[in-house]
C-alpha cells in the first residue's frame, strides 16, 4: 500500500467467515508492503548495530561471567515475550495500530497517547544520539590509526558523523525505502563483528592471564550492576515495534511473529559471539568500544571502524523513522518523495532534528551512560511495563486469574527496575560529568 492510499480507509482481512474490516490510519509513509523476511532484517539490523561493540564493556564488565551470560539469556527470553505481546495487539479493536502511541491511545485514552509518544520520542532520540556518538568514535578511531597529532577531537568527528546521517536521512524517504540498504547493513555488521571476534581471539590467545573481577567499591558495584541491567534490555528492544510492524504485509500478526522469532534466534547469535569473546579476551579492562581494545593490522581495524560508521548511519535512520513519519504526516508531505518541495522539507525537518541530536551527542559523549539511561527511562516502560499492562487491559476478559497475576507481577517488577536503573544511570552521568568536561575528547 502506498502512502497516498493509507488514508483512514478500511480493508478486509482474513478468509471465509473470519473476514473482518481493519481500519488503516492516516500516514504519509508506505505501509503493508514488506515481506516478513525484510522486516526480520530491519530488526536484526537493530540488534546487531554497532552498539554490539560496546556490550563486552558495558554489560559483561559490570556483571562478570555468570551475571553477564545469565542476564543476556534472560533478557533475550523476556524481550521476545514482551515483543510478542505488542505484536499480537497490532489489529486490536478492528484497527491497525501503526504507531506505538496509537495503540496506547486506543486502549487507555488521549493522555496515554501523548505520554507514550513522549516516552518513545525520548527513547528514540537517546538511541540516535548514541548512534551518532558511535559513528563519531569510530571515525576518530580511524583518524588516530594514521595520525596521532590530536588536532581533531571527538566533538569534531561527531559533527562529521551527524552530517553523514543527515545526508542519508534526506535521501531515504521512509523505512520501506531502505530496501537494498538492509543487505548493505548486514554486510557491514558482519565486517566489524568478524574483525572484532578474530582480533579478540588472537589477543586472547597471546595474553592468557586476564582479570575478570568486577571492579569498584560495594556501592559503585551496586550502581554499575543496576545500570548494566538497563543495558541488557536496551540491547534487544527497539521501542518502535508497531512502527516496524506497520510495514509488513498481511497477515501482519503472523508475519511479525516470524520476524521476531528470526530476530531472537539467528539474529542474536552474532551479538552473543562478539560480546562473550570480547570479554573473554580482555576481561575487566575491555573498552566500552571493543575496537579500541583489539590489536591488529591498521587496514583491518580501519575497515572495521568504517563499517561501524556506515552501519550506524543506516541504523539511525531506522530508529529515527517514527519521528520522520510524524513530521511528514503532520505537514502533509504527498506525491513523489524526491520532488523539490519534499526534498527541501526533509532538508529542513530531518536536518534540524539530526543537528540537535548531534549537538547533544557532542556535548555529553558518554555512550555507556546513554545506553543505561535509555534502558531505564524508556525501554523498561515501553517494552515491559506498558506491553504487559496493555495486553492485560486488552485481553482482560480472556485471561484467567493466574495470567492476570503474572502480568501484574511483570508491571510491578519492571517498574521497580526502571526506577532503580534510572537512579544508577543519573549517578553514572553525574560521576562522568565531574571527571570530564562538556564536549569531552574521550
Curated annotation (Swiss-Prot):
Treatment with toxic concentrations of proline reduces shoot growth and root elongation in wild-type plants, while plant lines over-expressing PROT1 stop growing shortly after unfolding of cotyledons. Signal peptide: none annotated. One of its GO terms (molecular function) is L-proline transmembrane transporter activity. It is a multi-pass membrane protein. InterPro entries: AA_transpt_TM (IPR013057). PANTHER family: OS05G0424000 PROTEIN-RELATED. Keywords: Amino-acid transport, Cell membrane, Membrane, Transmembrane, Transmembrane helix, Transport. GO terms for cellular component: plasma membrane. Disruption phenotype: No visible phenotype under normal growth conditions. Belongs to the amino acid/polyamine transporter 2 family. Amino acid/auxin permease (AAAP) (TC 2.A.18.3) subfamily. The chain crosses the membrane at residues 35-55, 58-78, 124-144, 157-177, 178-198, 222-242, 260-280, 302-322, 351-371, 372-392, 411-431. It is found in: Cell membrane. Expressed in vascular tissues of roots, leaves, stems, sepals, petals, stamen and siliques. Expressed in pollen. This is Proline transporter 1. GO terms for biological process: proline transport. Proline transporter that mediates proline and glycine betaine transport. May be involved in long-distance transport of proline and required for phloem loading, retrieval of proline leaking from the phloem, or in xylem-to-phloem transfer. When expressed in a heterologous system (yeast), imports D- and L-proline, glycine betaine and GABA across the plasma membrane. Has the same affinity for D- and L-proline. It comes from the Eukaryota.
Amino acid at each position: 500500500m502506498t502512502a497516498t492510499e493509507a488514508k483512514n480507509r478500511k480493508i478486509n482481512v482474513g478468509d471465509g467467515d473470519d473476514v473482518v474490516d481493519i481500519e488503516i490510519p492516516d500516514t504519509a509513509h508506505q505501509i503493508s508492503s514488506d515481506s516478513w523476511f525484510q522486516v526480520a532484517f530491519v530488526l536484526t539490523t537493530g540488534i546487531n548495530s554497532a552498539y554490539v561493540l560496546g556490550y563486552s564493556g558495558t554489560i559483561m564488565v559490570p556483571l562478570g561471567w555468570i551475571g553477564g551470560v545469565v542476564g543476556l539469556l534472560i533478557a533475550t527470553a523476556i524481550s521476545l515475550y514482551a515483543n510478542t505481546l505488542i505484536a499480537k495487539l497490532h489489529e486490536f479493536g478492528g484497527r491497525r495500530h501503526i504507531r506505538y502511541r496509537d495503540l496506547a491511545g486506543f486502549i487507555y485514552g488521549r493522555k496515554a497517547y501523548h505520554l507514550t509518544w513522549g516516552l518513545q520520542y525520548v527513547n528514540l532520540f537517546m538511541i540516535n544520539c548514541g548512534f551518532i556518538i558511535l559513528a563519531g568514535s569510530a571515525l576518530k578511531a580511524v583518524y588516530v590509526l594514521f595520525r596521532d597529532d590530536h588536532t581533531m577531537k571527538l566533538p569534531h568527528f561527531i559533527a562529521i558523523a551527524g552530517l553523514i546521517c543527515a545526508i542519508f536521512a534526506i535521501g531515504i524517504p521512509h523505512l520501506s525505502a531502505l530496501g537494498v540498504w538492509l543487505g548493505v547493513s548486514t554486510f557491514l555488521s558482519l565486517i566489524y563483528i568478524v574483525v572484532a571476534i578474530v582480533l579478540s581471539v588472537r589477543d586472547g590467545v597471546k595474553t592468557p592471564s586476564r582479570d575478570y573481577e568486577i571492579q569498584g567499591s560495594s556501592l559503585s558495584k551496586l550502581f554499575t550492576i543496576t545500570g548494566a541491567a538497563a543495558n541488557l534490555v536496551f540491547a534487544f528492544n527497539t521501542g518502535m515495534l508497531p512502527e516496524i510492524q506497520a510495514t509488513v504485509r498481511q497477515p501482519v500478526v503472523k508475519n511479525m511473529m516470524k520476524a521476531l522469532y528470526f530476530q531472537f534466534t539467528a539474529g542474536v547469535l552474532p551479538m552473543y559471539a562478539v560480546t562473550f569473546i570480547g570479554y573473554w579476551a580482555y576481561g575487566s579492562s575491555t573498552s566500552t568500544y571493543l575496537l579500541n581494545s583489539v590489536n591488529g593490522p591498521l587496514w583491518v581495524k580501519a575497515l572495521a571502524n568504517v563499517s561501524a560508521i556506515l552501519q550506524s548511519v543506516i541504523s539511525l535512520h531506522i530508529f529515527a523513522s517514527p519521528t520522520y513519519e510524524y513530521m511528514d504526516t503532520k505537514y502533509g508531505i504527498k506525491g513523489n518523495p524526491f520532488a523539490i518541495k519534499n526534498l527541501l522539507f526533509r532538508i529542513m525537518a530531518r536536518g534540524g532534528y539530526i543537528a540537535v541530536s548531534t549537538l547533544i551527542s557532542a556535548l555529553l559523549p558518554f555512550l555507556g551512560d546513554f545506553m543505561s539511561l535509555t534502558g531505564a527511562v524508556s525501554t523498561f516502560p515501553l517494552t515491559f511495563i506498558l506491553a504487559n499492562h496493555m495486553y492485560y487491559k486488552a485481553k482482560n476478559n480472556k485471561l484467567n486469574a493466574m495470567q492476570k497475576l503474572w502480568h501484574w507481577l511483570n508491571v510491578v517488577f519492571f517498574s521497580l527496575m526502571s526506577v532503580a536503573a534510572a537512579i544508577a544511570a543519573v549517578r553514572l552521568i553525574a560521576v562522568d560529568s565531574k571527571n570530564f568536561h562538556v564536549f569531552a575528547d574521550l
